[in-house]
């Protein structure tokens, strides 16, 4: 039985399950007969077209999409940018007489209206999706295509099928995991929600896999190196797993705001068995002391391998470091911020209340607190839910502090962000 249950059924007109797991997929039938007898074009000379092989051109595509550093044996591309795909047929493809459809699926219940089933057809001026396709060249029996995912498509792992339209029905290629590919957010694409204009900033906030996290206090600023390791083996799979384990519907994973907000809840374990369990005591016998961590890779790989058991223990800089890895891994420009003399609002009134008793001593029972330092994250994205001038660097905090209402989560959860 899969670890993830399908989300509750849609109670609207569709009345079908909503897929919340990228780890499950639908195996499409190899042949579908046409339900109605309708006029068909004559069979092309040489017989029906048949798919012999699909080439994802991983090396050239990953270089072009700035994903060559990921240690994973699958194609990884960024949305809103063309990638090359080759289809080897049993004979030379003829654009005038042959017809085939490329299908990209994500999740167990793919449907076009939720952008989980994408169909593109070479030669058609009007596509059924916002994905683009063009014939680059045909050499012998291989046809190379340029495919451009929509700049607002779902981020995650897609399955690939090629379906040839024949007089009898649809002949589909077999399920082949080697043609699966990941789509990430794209800070290089102007139409993407996370577009970042400056190349130096893209290199630093997306591609840099190490950094310094500042700590200490205002009069004695310290720092510790942190290995974000967003390209290391298993990390991309772990980041997708985090969204799956949090039961985030696939149809919402096209929106950077929703992905960031969901992830800010899933990095802490307080109410959803997220990645890290916090501890501000001096007893770390049941886990690892927060000061002992030097990077995110071990934490995320442990959480992924143990299928959602929170890793012990964390404090603010550990939460921020791991969250930074998650964001950069999925293509979101992100950085860790340290704030000194950091006021903590205990009751949500957006004020810092310092209460003294009659002797002038601090009343810790009713006072808000001021921490020596606190770490959070900033992520660069365009806000479509508030006025455009608030777009840019947004504050997101995965350290569990106070409850926050969220559209994507049941009832109340410990999450924070995005805030301009």
Model segments located where?
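Short, compositionally biased P/S/T/A/G/V-rich stretches that sit at domain boundaries
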Residues: 2-82
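Nucleo/cytoplasmic regulatory scaffolds in medium-to-very-large eukaryotic proteins
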Residues: 2-11, 16-26, 77, 107-112, ...
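Contiguous beta-strand segments within globular domains
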Residues: 56-106, 142-146
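Eukaryotic intrinsically disordered and solvent-exposed regulatory patches
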Residues: 70-74, 88-89, 132, 145-149, ...
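Conserved beta-strand elements of beta-rich interaction domains across eukaryotes
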Residues: 90-94, 107-109, 165-167, 188-190, ...
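Extended acidic/polar, glycine-enriched regions
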Residues: 94-213
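Secondary-structure boundary elements
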Residues: 191-335, 345
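Hydrophobic/aromatic-rich core segments of domains that either
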Residues: 296-420
């Amino acid at each position: 039985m899969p670890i993830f249950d399908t989300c509750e059924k849609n109670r609207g007109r569709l009345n079908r399950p909503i897929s919340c797991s990228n780890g499950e997929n639908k195996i499409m039938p190899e042949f579908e007969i046409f339900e109605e007898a309708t006029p068909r074009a004559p069979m092309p000379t040489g017989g029906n077209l048949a798919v012999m092989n699909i080439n994802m051109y991983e090396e050239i595509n990953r270089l072009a999409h700035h994903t060559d550093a990921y240690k994973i044996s699958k194609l990884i591309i960024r949305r809103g940018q063309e990638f090359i795909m080759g289809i080897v047929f049993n004979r030379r493809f003829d654009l005038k007489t042959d017809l085939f459809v490329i299908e990209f699926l994500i999740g167990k219940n793919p449907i076009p209206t939720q952008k989980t089933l994408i169909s593109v057809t070479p030669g058609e001026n009007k596509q059924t999706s916002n994905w683009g396709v063009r014939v680059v060249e045909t050499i012998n029996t291989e046809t190379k295509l340029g495919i451009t995912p929509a700049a607002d498509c779902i981020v995650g792992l897609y399955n690939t099928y090629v379906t040839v339209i024949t007089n009898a029905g649809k002949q589909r290629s077999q399920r082949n995991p080697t043609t699966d590919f990941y789509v990430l957010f794209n800070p290089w694409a102007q139409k993407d929600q996370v577009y970042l204009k400056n190349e130096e900033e893209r290199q630093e906030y997306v591609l840099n896999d190490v950094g310094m996290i500042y700590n200490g206090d205002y009069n004695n600023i310290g720092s510790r190196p942190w290995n974000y390791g967003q390209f290391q083996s298993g990390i991309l799979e772990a980041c997708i797993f985090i969204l799956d384990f949090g039961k985030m519907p696939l149809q919402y994973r096209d929106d950077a705001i929703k992905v960031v907000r969901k992830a800010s809840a899933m990095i802490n374990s307080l109410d959803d068995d997220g990645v890290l369990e916090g501890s501000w005591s001096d007893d770390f016998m049941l886990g690892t002391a927060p000061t002992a961590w030097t990077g995110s890779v071990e934490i995320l790989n442990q959480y992924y391998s143990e299928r959602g058991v929170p890793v012990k223990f964390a404090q603010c800089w550990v939460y921020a470091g791991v969250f930074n890895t998650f964001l950069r891994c999925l293509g979101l420009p992100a950085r860790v911020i340290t704030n000194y003399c950091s006021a903590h609002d205990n009751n949500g009134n957006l004020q810092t209340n310092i209460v003294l008793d009659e002797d002038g001593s601090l009343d810790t029972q009713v006072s808000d607190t001021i921490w020596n330092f606190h770490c959070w994250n900033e992520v660069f994205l365009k806000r479509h839910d508030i006025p455009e001038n608030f777009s840019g660097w947004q504050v997101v905090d995965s350290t569990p502090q106070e409850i926050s209402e969220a559209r994507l989560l049941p009832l109340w959860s410990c999450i924070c962000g995005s805030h301009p």
